């Protein structure tokens, strides 16, 4: 998606440790008009696919998935929670995940009533790096007996193993921008 690449080049900041900071439009402050274009692009990438639900992970994926939902006939969006909560039923699907950016392990959970056998689920998230969060969401889909349509990623760090990990599982991955490298405070795309 050329408009996304341009926005990353113009507004993104490269940080030490292969971190790309896009908090000015994607995962802190959100450019809603632009995210609408992201949602339309996901619809285009998954044209002809029946989608019953969109699954993401809190927190950065929620807005993206919610906006994308309107282009998939307003299907429900389910987000995996990273923390236990009194308002989350005990009857949950649960998976272990490692966060690349936070450098910690945690469990993600989805109430069993929100992912059902036979549903066609599209996973959408902001970043793909090592693929750990996405693998955790795939595990939740499998536990539910639902069918995975594919993975929609806004920004993929193509120099890390996430895509290979997911494709080795036989999963379709659609990334809107793929970064080849982050070097000398610059972003290079594939």
Curated annotation (Swiss-Prot):
Keyword Cytoplasm tagged: yes
UniProt-annotated binding residues for 5-phospho-alpha-D-ribose 1-diphosphate: 129-133
Source species, domain of life: Bacteria
Pfam family, one: Pribosyltran
GO molecular function: xanthine phosphoribosyltransferase activity
Subcellular compartments: Cytoplasm
Key words, A-Z: Cytoplasm, Glycosyltransferase, Purine salvage, Transferase
Reaction catalyzed: XMP + diphosphate = xanthine + 5-phospho-alpha-D-ribose 1-diphosphate
Quaternary structure annotation from Swiss-Prot or TrEMBL: Homodimer.
Role summary: Converts the preformed base xanthine, a product of nucleic acid breakdown, to xanthosine 5'-monophosphate (XMP), so it can be reused for RNA or DNA synthesis.
Protein family: Belongs to the purine/pyrimidine phosphoribosyltransferase family. Xpt subfamily.
Listed name of the protein: Xanthine phosphoribosyltransferase 1
Annotated gene: xpt1
């Amino acid at each position: 998606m050329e408009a996304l690449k341009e926005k990353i080049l113009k507004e993104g900041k490269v940080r030490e440790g292969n971190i790309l900071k896009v908090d000015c439009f994607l995962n802190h402050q959100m450019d809603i008009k632009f995210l609408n274009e992201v949602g339309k692009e996901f619809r285009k990438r998954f044209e002809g696919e029946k989608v019953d639900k969109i699954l993401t992970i809190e927190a950065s994926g929620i807005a993206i998935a919610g906006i994308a939902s309107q282009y998939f006939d307003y299907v429900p969006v389910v987000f995996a929670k990273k923390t236990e909560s009194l308002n989350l039923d005990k009857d949950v699907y649960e998976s272990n995940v490692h966060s690349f950016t936070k450098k910690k392990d945690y469990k993600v959970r989805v109430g069993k009533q929100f992912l059902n056998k036979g549903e066609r689920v599209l996973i959408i998230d902001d970043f793909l790096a090592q693929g750990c969060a996405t693998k955790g969401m795939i595990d939740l889909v499998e536990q539910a007996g639902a069918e995975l349509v594919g993975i929609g990623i806004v920004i993929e760090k193509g120099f890390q193993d996430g895509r290979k990990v997911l494709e080795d599982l036989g999963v379709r991955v659609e990334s809107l921008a793929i970064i080849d490298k982050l070097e000398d405070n610059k972003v290079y795309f594939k």
